[in-house]
């Protein structure tokens, strides 16, 4: 079984991984922005801590470190990084995240597309690139 971490929108790869017996999508970085238990006695402080701890607030290096941390913690075989067209943050940060993951020996696939309008995504091309990446991950897994 190949374990995949995801950065950004999953809509570009959902169909390829749904109900797959060979591959499993572990998580999206959008869901682990600030993992801590809120204090019900101090809801506003808890909200502030969550906002300040969000990986989207601050430098991309912090987000890259968190992505690497979660990929290691969840034993991901690879990471798919979705870059939304026109988003300077994700496009500019993709290389930084790739470099950080390479330090840990985790390969990354970058997919570019429109995260807002699915009609602007070439599903066939994305599926082909994802399948090639999954084959690479499978070869790496067998070689170990």
Kindly give the residue locations of the regions a language model identified.
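Charged, low-complexity surface segments at secondary-structure and domain boundaries
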Residues: 12, 34, 114-118
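Hydrophobic alpha/beta core scaffold segments
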Residues: 18-22, 27, 40-46, 50, ...
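Single conserved hydrophobic/aromatic residue that forms the stacking wall/gate
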Residues: 1-8, 12-15
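Small-residue-rich helix-loop
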Residues: 28-36
């Amino acid at each position: 079984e190949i374990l995949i971490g995801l950065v950004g929108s999953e809509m570009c790869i959902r169909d390829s991984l749904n109900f797959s017996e060979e591959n499993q999508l572990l998580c999206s970085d959008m869901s682990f922005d600030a993992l801590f238990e809120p204090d019900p006695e101090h809801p506003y402080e808890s909200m502030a801590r969550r906002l300040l701890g969000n990986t989207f607030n601050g430098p991309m290096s912090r987000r890259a470190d968190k992505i690497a941390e979660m990929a290691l913690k969840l034993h991901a075989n690879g990471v798919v990084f979705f870059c939304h067209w026109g988003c300077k943050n994700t496009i500019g940060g993709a290389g930084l995240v790739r470099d950080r993951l390479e330090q840990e020996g985790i390969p990354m696939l970058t997919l570019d597309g429109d995260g807002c309008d699915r009609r602007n995504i070439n599903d066939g091309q994305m599926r082909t690139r994802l399948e090639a990446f999954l084959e690479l991950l499978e070869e790496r897994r067998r070689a170990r």
